Amino acid sequence: MIILGIETSCDETSASVLHNGVVLSNIVSSQHCHTSFGGVVPELASREHERLITAITETAINEANIQKDALDVIAATAGPGLIGAIMVGLCFAQGMACALNIPFVPINHIEAHIFSPFINSGANSPLPKEGYISLTVSGGHTLLALVKPDLSYTIVGKTLDDAAGEAFDKTGKMIGLPYPAGPVIDKLAENGNPNFYHFPRALTSRSKSRKSWEGNLDFSFSGMKTSVLTWLQQQSPESVASNLPDIAASIQAAIVDVLVEKSIAAAKHYNVSTIAIAGGVSANRGLRSSMQAACQQHGITLCLPETIYSTDNAAMIASIAALKLSHGMEPLYRYNVAPYASFLHKDNFS
């Protein structure tokens, strides 16, 4: 089966061709027009998707060395995300499916991330038999899901306020880093001291009140952001500039420690021996290193996506479409956009 995947949920325009679970092409164009605004501007994102989507799709098909009429299914992100951005990809994909008279599969963007560590394993290849804990962490989402052997899943932890990726970007902006600040913090932290300053780790064993975190798998990063801002207001600009790697390392440690501790706690609580990390922040080298060390300490297997599949991409859209179809999902010929978070059901795979 040959599947074309389309992804336009935020600020990446992407198209990918998948053949029997193997990625033949994965073209991603990241938008840089938002940098001066310090964040993604929805209207600009939509216009960029509209400008690029045809060329990106044609490039993906050409790189896969196939003709359009060889496609069996087209899949596209239907939510959650920016409504205008999603509409561009969704309408394009449905229009193309209609023109080719082939089925269409609407995809939950977060589900695609959850299963992205297993891209290229093939639609019929076995995933962890006992299920696994998925940590999906990005600029807009931070959640823990218990993925069961039948591929259904339950959300067992989520952010109560800000996503981890947002915490990276906003604290990075506070210390003068360009948007997106997450990758810059990661690079600076390589040469910094994570113990330079201890920023709070909310709802963890390092919290002041043990009762506030025991058994709690939710996340909170707003307090950490406020702590960074308050601390910076007490420092001179010269001091911040001269200690930038140490500050970046301290910020990263505060975020990573929470992500690692919650993931390990979830795996123990639900008695599974595999953790998979997904989403844009899964490309963070500090997170990968710390999670690997923690998993080795607790006898847990860690599954990581290839870095090219960490951020938003269409290969994960096509890949989960293949999984859904192989598990009995009936494809559609029409679907409406669903930008809201409730599109992510607690138990939803089919």
From Swiss-Prot:
Return the GO cellular component terms, semicolon-separated: cytoplasm
Chain residues that bind substrate: 136-140, 169, 182, 186, 284
The function of this protein is:
Required for the formation of a threonylcarbamoyl group on adenosine at position 37 (t(6)A37) in tRNAs that read codons beginning with adenine. Is involved in the transfer of the threonylcarbamoyl moiety of threonylcarbamoyl-AMP (TC-AMP) to the N6 group of A37, together with TsaE and TsaB. TsaD likely plays a direct catalytic role in this reaction.
Residues holding Fe cation: 109, 113, 312
- Descriptive protein name: tRNA N6-adenosine threonylcarbamoyltransferase
Q: Give the UniProt record's GO annotations in the biological process aspect.
A: tRNA threonylcarbamoyladenosine modification
**Cross-referenced Pfam families:** TsaD
- Listed InterPro entries: ATPase_NBD (IPR043129), Gcp-like_dom (IPR000905), KAE1/TsaD (IPR017861), TsaD (IPR022450)
Q: What's the catalysed reaction?
A: L-threonylcarbamoyladenylate + adenosine(37) in tRNA = N(6)-L-threonylcarbamoyladenosine(37) in tRNA + AMP + H(+)
UniProt keywords, alphabetically: Acyltransferase, Cytoplasm, Iron, Metal-binding, Transferase, tRNA processing
Originating gene = tsaD
Name the HAMAP family on file: TsaD (MF_01445)
- Give compartment(s): Cytoplasm
**Molecular function terms in GO for this entry?**
iron ion binding; N(6)-L-threonylcarbamoyladenine synthase activity
The UniProt family comment states:
Belongs to the KAE1 / TsaD family.
UniProt xrefs under SUPFAM superfamilies: Actin-like ATPase domain (SSF53067)
UniProt cofactor(s): Fe(2+)
Predominant location category: cytoplasm
Check the record and name the PANTHER family matching this protein: TRNA N6-ADENOSINE THREONYLCARBAMOYLTRANSFERASE, TRNA N6-ADENOSINE THREONYLCARBAMOYLTRANSFERASE, MITOCHONDRIAL
Q: What is its EC number?
A: 2.3.1.234
Cofactor-binding details, from the entry: Binds 1 Fe(2+) ion per subunit.
